[in-house]
């Protein structure tokens, strides 16, 4: 018996958006209007690339960024939940699928000593250039019309499950924990014995609810959470079964 836990990162594991939090490093703690207004829907990663250039141009160094990022608060109950998962790793495989980037997620998980809880992190690759600028790239290319062009979480999940099957690993149940609009595509891929756990009051919960109202509900079970303690209670029930 093994369960797969799939986590989003921003507004799920942490209680903020890591990409907008980095703006605290700018000289005025805000971006100039021209840069802020340059975002085009579906092209967030390119926008963040421009933000990182602006930070570099203003002399913001790696250590300052790291200090700022590691002050992001975890979502209520999340520290307890990740501790619980860490104590039961023989039953839980755990992955992150996120539109953030490798540098931010790595900093935050390592600072809190949670990096060993997660088996894999799927997110946009980022690195510091020789001149000290943070650069970010698209995670992959895909053909899904519903998702931003740099990341389709359904594709990531499907490829991960296929790879695990090749290794002889299959899961009793998939538990998908997220909050955003880009979490709907993978949730619609889940089967009836899986469970989606959307965060209360966020886009994913609203979109799942709209599907149910239009009589095309998702196949999986749905359990809304407001604190990660709700998620932990559910996982404890799973282990009792």
Predicted features along the sequence, with ranges:
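Alpha-helical substrate-recognition element adjacent to the catalytic core
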Residues: 1-125, 130
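C-terminal cap/substrate-recognition subdomain and adjoining C-terminal extension
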Residues: 76-84, 88-95, 100-241
